Amino acid sequence: MTTAAAPAKTTELRLFPVSIESFDARLLEMDLYLKPAPDAPAVLYRTTGIEFTLQDRQRLMEQHIEFLYIPMSQHKAYRRLLSDRVEETFHDPHLQRVERARLIRASCKRMIEDVLIFPNQPEPIAMIADMSRKFATWATEDPQQFSYLLDMSGHDYYTTLHMVSVGVGCGLLVNELRPGDEELRTALVEGGMLHDLGKRGIPAELLNKEGKLAPDEWQTIRRHPLIGADELRNNPAVPAFVIEMVRDHHERPDGTGYPEGLRDARVSFAARICAV
């Protein structure tokens, strides 16, 4: 059943885009809006409590609709949906390991994209915190399966998938160095997935530039750890440990890192883990 309505007044209702691949067959716990055309206003598509089916998803894809829109006020319900889905995927014995890894990494990629799209919003950061707790549990519950998320990593260091990979790697490394410390493991996974938050505003052509950077370009790159840390500092739910990790992940014990050129013990354990 499709519920039509007048276009959503975006001045009153803040919406965020969600890939339709995020949805599987289930009873909706949130309202869904869609845009009939890229520049068209959003209209109500399904209301809370109505079933969304795989056939519905397929029909939308056939109409070349890639995104649905959810009210920001219902972000917590979307967090639950995505969290439940990745949990089910990780433990699904019917999925090949490669497919499990692909689905989980794709979900985490979307979570990080939400953080980048909506700066200074607590809801997307809370979703990363939820996922970090799952990663921390998986790292000890089934380290072999969890490590496969890292095995799927590529080599593009300026993508959200790279940030997912760093979060996975931090979880694995801390599990080896500090086994049993779940709080630390969770914090470092979160820091790993957020470590390059400050690169949001840097043009892709600069991030991917080959060869030596001009002095002004280098200064732009050097500032990204401080920019990311400053943004997270505005969110009281983010642990200080995570903020420190984001700020210092390019520092090196010999003083050759940036942005401050910290040396020796001034480079925190968290920053060293992220650097690896």
Q: Which positions does each model-derived feature cover?
A:
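Histidine- and acidic-residue-rich, metal-dependent catalytic cores
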Residues: 5-7, 105-276
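Non-catalytic interface/linker regions that flank or bridge core catalytic/transmembrane domains
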Residues: 1-160
